[in-house]
């Protein structure tokens, strides 16, 4: 199937019909020297640039799309899970701070304020040493 086979005679460019028609400047002369011959298109459809995917290429394309879809879905799930874990850890940290504050307030009722401050500093020091 040539590109000009579907056209009407008047629509076909002259270079395909008339051998004496002037050539394009960039086209140059033929290698075999037969410049009087008519220019023709490729006979096979594959060489015209129209490409039909084979079943293997089609499967590979689908597999690639499916893989990209799965990775994107997994990334979204991971982001959601990370956000959830972050909220939980923030909540735990706030609860720990609140519990520690209440404990020091209870101690302050029983003891002198300076002694509570000393105990707080000592506990912070021990906590820092333990975390190392």
Swiss-Prot record:
Domain of life: Eukaryota
Coiled-coil boundaries: 57-115
Subcellular location: Nucleus, Nucleolus
Region (Disordered): 1-32, 75-94, 113-132
Residue ranges with Basic and acidic residues bias: 8-17
Skewed-composition ranges (Basic residues): 113-125
Entry keywords, A to Z: Coiled coil, Nucleus, Ribosome biogenesis, rRNA processing
One GO BP: rRNA processing
Record has RNA-binding as a keyword: no
Annotated GO CC locations: nucleolus
General function of this protein: Involved in nucleolar integrity and required for processing of the pre-rRNA for the 60S ribosome subunit.
Family statement drawn from the similarity comment of this UniProt entry: Belongs to the CGR1 family.
Protein name: rRNA-processing protein CGR1
């Amino acid at each position: 199937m040539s590109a000009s086979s579907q056209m009407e005679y008047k629509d076909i460019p002259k270079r395909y019909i008339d051998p004496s028609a002037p050539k394009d400047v960039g086209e140059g002369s033929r290698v075999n020297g037969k410049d009087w011959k008519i220019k023709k298109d490729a006979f096979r459809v594959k060489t015209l640039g129209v490409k039909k995917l084979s079943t293997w290429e089609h499967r590979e394309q689908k597999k690639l799309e499916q893989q990209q879809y799965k990775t994107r879905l997994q990334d979204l799930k991971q982001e959601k899970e990370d956000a959830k874990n972050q909220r939980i850890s923030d909540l735990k940290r706030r609860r720990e701070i609140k519990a520690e504050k209440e404990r020091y307030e209870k101690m302050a009722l029983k003891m002198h304020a300076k002694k509570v401050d000393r105990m707080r500093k000592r506990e912070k020091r021990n906590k820092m040493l333990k975390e190392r």
